[in-house]
Amino acid sequence: ADMKYKCLIFDLDGTLVNSIHALTYCTNLSLEKFGLGPLTEEQMMTIVGDGYKMQMKRSLAACGDTDEAHYEAILPVYMEIFGKYCNYEMHPYDGIVELTSKAKELGLKIAVVSNKPDAQAKKTVEYVFGAGYFDTVIGEQEGVPKKPDPSGALKAAKICGADPSECLYFGDTNTDMKTGKNAKMTTVG
């Protein structure tokens, strides 16, 4: 069968891996240093997905710090804690390993595009799937606009040698669906 698609691009958190435990754990450790929190995983579900700065802003607001008194101070604290514990209770969703290994068998390229800081995105993917499993992993970097801007997705397609029309984009949020659309890719989610 002639496959129309050459490349599968995945969001990381909430799509490939269940990271809500890690995000909640690291956020609460950070909040605790300022005498705030803790937040529940249910609360965190509504807070994450738009990068760590937005996550901290919303977390502080959820704890009553709406004037962002601790916002500047908490960012480096969170980054340090997250660097250590970004893979806390991290595991892939059911069926993901099967899906990605099947894709590899068929000769498709697989990529990850995430709003998670680049170093942690790479670290998490390597921790869960092993080194070199994905053809490319792109996290949030200086100078690359965050999703729903399509820059990351388009960069991944280019690295994988695929035209956007030959890419399937998998995600779990509205942000992801917009990203795929903006990149002119077929979205799944």
Model-inferred region functions:
Residues G37, K109, T186:
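Residue-level detector of anion-binding/catalytic polar loops
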Residues Y88-H91, P117-M185:
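Substrate-recognition "cap/lid" segment bordering the active-site pocket of phosphatases
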Residues G49-K84, D94, K102:
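A metal-dependent, Asp-based hydrolase signature
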Residues K4-K6, E80-V112, D118-K122, P150, ...:
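Short, acidic loop-to-helix structural element flanking the phosphoryl-transfer center
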